[in-house]
Curated annotation (Swiss-Prot):
Gene behind this protein: ybx2-b
Stretches the record annotates as Disordered: 1-29, 103-324
One Pfam family matching this protein: CSD
Location of the protein in the cell: Cytoplasm
UniProt KW keywords: Cytoplasm, Phosphoprotein, Ribonucleoprotein, RNA-binding, Transcription, Transcription regulation, Translation regulation
Species of the source: Xenopus laevis (African clawed frog)
Subcellular location, principal: cytoplasm
The protein's name in its UniProt record: Y-box-binding protein 2-B
Length: 324
């Protein structure tokens, strides 16, 4: 019984053979499935090729026969082109196979097996993607140290050198074109030099404006609102009054031109008030000089050529003759 038990265990422990996994065969190109080969290494000239649709025709040099070509039949494409294509009038080398509707080209290459040139309408590959990420890599290398790889540096040295330099990198100024187009005011690089100018302007114009200390305490990019600087250049439109017609002539115009624009309205109003009544005041002054003398009887003494006063009113004569 003891001998039979190990045999049973051995039979049980023997692993069963794993079933064989059949890997799918590599599918040949579409134009080469069950197709009969008619000719090899035939040269021809591309008659036309549509890049968008991906097919065209090649004219054989030996038999002058047109052979259909699909973009999947191109074996060696131009490495600079994004899509497979052949250019119009290009000389190519290919194999001829029998298709469903006639002869088709396969394994299309350039003469001698070189890559084809491709169509000029085919898009080129984008080769300069890495340039956008290079500045970040350069800054990381500068922060880590000059001429020292990050592997050679210890963890303590990395923490000491990278920690103080990573903080200012987070507050980088925006690009030049963005700063020039969308933002106005002092640039972040010249904040120290222009701090005094901002404080002087704020004290003279707006006492409630933030000072240089308030700007320094906040972010480096904090600036006063742009409207404050635009108000002094934009003023409401006011129609200018017509120039007054004064007897003085060019003197009044010269004075008006010499004064600033903001003070043109006030002198004009005062000048207008003074200039309107002269004709009326001349008549009114002459009339009161006659009527009060006749009505009230007040003497009006006027100097003569000899310097002695002359009594012009009749009331004055009566007063002098009354005592006699």
């Amino acid at each position: 019984m003891s001998e039979a038990e190990p045999r049973e265990t051995e039979a049980v422990t023997q692993p069963e053979p794993a079933p064989e996994i059949h890997k799918p065969d590599i599918v040949p190109p579409r134009n080469q499935i069950n197709k009969k080969l008619l000719a090899t290494q035939v040269q021809g000239t591309v008659k036309w090729f549509n890049v968008r649709n991906g097919y065209g025709f090649i004219n054989r040099n030996d038999s002058k026969e047109d052979v259909f070509v699909h973009q999947t039949a191109i074996k060696k494409n131009n490495p600079r082109k994004f899509l497979r294509s052949v250019g119009d009038g290009e000389t190519v080398e290919f194999d001829v196979v029998e298709g469903e509707k006639g002869a088709e080209a396969a394994n299309v290459t350039g003469p001698g097996g070189v890559p084809v040139k491709g169509s000029r309408f085919a898009p080129n590959r984008r080769r300069f993607r890495r340039q956008f990420y290079r500045p970040r890599a350069d800054t990381a290398g500068e922060s880590g140290g000059e001429g020292v790889s990050p592997e050679q540096m210890s963890e303590g040295e990395k923490g000491e050198e990278t920690s103080p330099q990573q903080r200012p990198q987070r507050r980088r100024p925006p690009p030049f074109f963005y700063r020039r187009r969308f933002r106005r005011g002092p640039r972040p690089n010249n904040q120290q030099n222009q701090g005094a100018e901002v404080t002087d302007q704020s004290e003279n114009k707006d006492p409630a404006a933030p000072t240089s200390e308030a700007l320094a305490s906040g972010d480096g990019q904090q600036r006063p609102p742009p409207r404050r600087f635009q108000q002094r250049f934009r003023r409401p439109f006011r129609p200018r009054p017509p120039p007054p017609q004064t007897p003085e002539g060019g003197d009044g115009e010269a004075k008006a031109e010499g004064e600033p624009q903001r003070q043109r309205n006030r002198p004009y109003v005062q000048r207008r008030r003074r200039q309107q009544p002269p004709t009326v005041q001349g008549e009114s002054k002459a009339e009161p000089s006659e009527h009060p003398a006749s009505e009230e009887g007040t003497p009006s003494d006027a100097p003569t050529d000899d310097g002695a006063p002359v009594e012009t009113s009749e009331a004055g004569v009566e007063d002098t003759t009354a005592p006699e």
